[in-house]
Amino acid sequence: CGIYENTGQKMILTDERSKKTKLICNENYERMRGMQMEVAGFLALGILVGLLGALLGIGGGMVIVPLLVFVWHYEPQLAIGTSVLVVLLNAVSGTWGYIRQKKVCVDAALKFAVATVPGAFLGSYAAEYLQGRLFYLVFGAFFVLAAINMYRKASKNAAGKTAGVVPEVYNWKLGVLCSVGVGFLASILGIGGGIVHVPFMVYVLNFPVHVAIATSTCILAVSSLAGLVSHAMLGHIVWTSGLAIGAGAFVGAQGGVALAQRLQSGILMKLASVLVLITGIKFLMNAL
């Protein structure tokens, strides 16, 4: 009888171990599946960001930050820092495409890019103070004002600048001054800065829209690199998600570069303004 009892106990223990093993396997499978779905979502987001970023010369941060905050529930600083990483990869890809098309104004790109660096470093440290309602209020107000300005400026006259030429003489000192502020905003908000640079270059410095977009994308590559270094030092970056989104953005940016040649400048500006306005309203609603 003792033999049967021992055998029965062993069978029960074996069944329990088998159930535990299956449970662990199922948990691991679900965890892996969840990670795969998350990576797939990040890649898809990256492709969209790259497409819009290169198409409009705005880096894509205005899409990344809201989604990381509202969908993936990232802390503001982590969303901003991770966005800067994606903006860098997106801008590098877009710059490569625009340089091949010979649409980048090298002189302006070099001067303005260097000017963004000090502002980018300051912005990354200022981002430490964007907490709670202040974060949503600052983002919302900035996005709404920028959207109104962009839509108002997207007139038929602006569309005529698409086929224009780069002015031989432009106020580069004013451009440098603006670029310092752009670097600050890009780093503190994680948005790239093209949302300010493109309208400024078009309506103040009289650059053709497509040249302004291409040059702004090149400038973003430098300013976001400076911002990335300082955000990394502060521990603001989630590298796994940032690299996944960035990989998709690198691919999507090439599509944006190709599509930008076929659209009128007025359409580009209006598309950007609507997207920015929706995002700004969402942020302001969260600040209430």
Positions of PLM-derived features:
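C-terminal membrane-cytosol helix-exit motif in multi-pass small-molecule transporters
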Residues: F143-S155
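Hydrophobic alpha-helical transmembrane segments of integral membrane proteins
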Residues: V39, L43-A54, P76, V84-V87, ...
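Selected transmembrane alpha-helices and immediately adjacent juxtamembrane segments
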Residues: C25, R31-E75, A159-I213, L243
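Juxtamembrane boundary at the C-terminal end of a transmembrane helix
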Residues: I281-L288
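Selective hydrophobic functional segments
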Residues: G81-L137, A141, S224-M269, V274, ...
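Transmembrane alpha-helical segments of multi-pass membrane transport proteins and ion-pumping complexes
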Residues: G46, G50-I58, M62, N90-T95, ...
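N-terminal amphipathic/basic-hydrophobic helices that include classical n-h-c signal peptides
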Residues: C1-Q36
